[in-house]
Amino acid sequence: MNKKDSSFYLIKGYPGLTNMAKYIMPYIPTSKVYVEPFAGLGRTVELRHDKIILNDMSDYAINYLKNEYGEYSETCEFPVIITQEDFKECILRWDSEETFFLIDPPWRKNIYKNNEKPFSNKTPIQYYDMLLNHILPNVKGNWILCVDRDEHEIGKRVSKSIYNNLVIQHPTVKLFGKSVAVRLCSNKEFKIE
């Protein structure tokens, strides 16, 4: 059985979605093109799509992705493409009705190695506002936007958006005394694929 048929998961990288990946994956539809505009270290990639695009502005993340996924590009029946461009350019370039975007922008400013600025001087809230109000309404493909807990400002803003919302909590893992949770926001209804 090849990795594509077995829906092989690759879970690694920053703590963001690492613990939640297996709970998020059932909501991700199989698509011809799978894109992560903020890939980080590629912690939630599921190898069941025809083409996978992992994008990040961080030099550290890009070098890691090239080392980690180079072997899969050669051994899988489908390409893993690694790009280093602004997330808006990445979304525009790969957008089609056959594309699925897993969009996981930084939740906080202080998570980057050596204070590396991965995008610009914008705050994470400004990125979410830009995505929800200007970019995602025009996307042809399907998408899921991942957000930190609801008690933070970003989670509150996303929960009030016009899009479908779903909160997933990890059943056992706790962080700062609370269950690890992520809010998902999408342009389509949430259903397990």
Placement of each model-derived feature along the sequence:
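Class I S-adenosyl-L-methionine-dependent methyltransferase catalytic core
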Residues: 1-193
